[in-house]
Amino acid sequence: RRNIITIFKGNDRYILEDTDVVLNKANQGVQTLERYKKVFDNKLSILNEYEFNDIVTLENVIVAIQRAEMVMRIVEDIQSQIYELGNDGRLVKMQLEELIGGVEKEELLIIKDYLAVTKKKKTPETVMEELSEIPYEELTKQVTVAKLLGYENFDNYDEVGVYTRGYRILSKIPRMPSNIVENLVLSYKSFQHILAADIESLDEVDGIGEVRARTIKQSLRRMQEQFVFDNIVV
């Protein structure tokens, strides 16, 4: 007879599987995560370039959020297996941390950039929580994500133009405090206005001196060049 370990908590019970079985599942999960992360990175790379060129559609935003959420759900499954593995899960944990760096933050900032202004006045964190709770089948529907972002139902989301506020891109500028990012967005309302602003104009924003204004302009120019390069098909 096999030795079986069962954990009880209240009316719930959980049967611990053999370590080799759990480790195999975790490794398979990491392989799946690598594929999903690659797709997310691709969608994010497209969004990066489109935001600079001001050609983002609602579909671009929805797909990026869907892919980020899919990645995070796989992460949750692997994390539960890591907990069960204990010390045997250290290598898997290291692989996981290396793979997912920044995905959750990117998703939150995408939502913050595109969350529609409605009477409900939802926060990006609230939308993130709502996304994590919907069934997978609903997550794959563009209308579901659009509704959570505060947009109405459209026949073709690829034909609905939207603009970014700029939180996500601006957060990539080195030594850029979140309060300065907030001041920029509040002052200019959209990323395109920030992109078009000259050094003198940026200098007038609270917390930004001439040195930081130059850093912002230079960093944005370098990022734009890099994002275009990233999407060149060889």
Task: Show the residue positions of the predicted features.
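Short, well-ordered alpha-helix to beta-strand connector turns
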Residues: 2-3, 188
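Conserved phosphate-handling catalytic cores of large alpha/beta enzymes
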Residues: 3-56
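Long, highly charged, low-complexity intrinsically disordered interaction regions
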Residues: 35-51, 57-204, 210-234
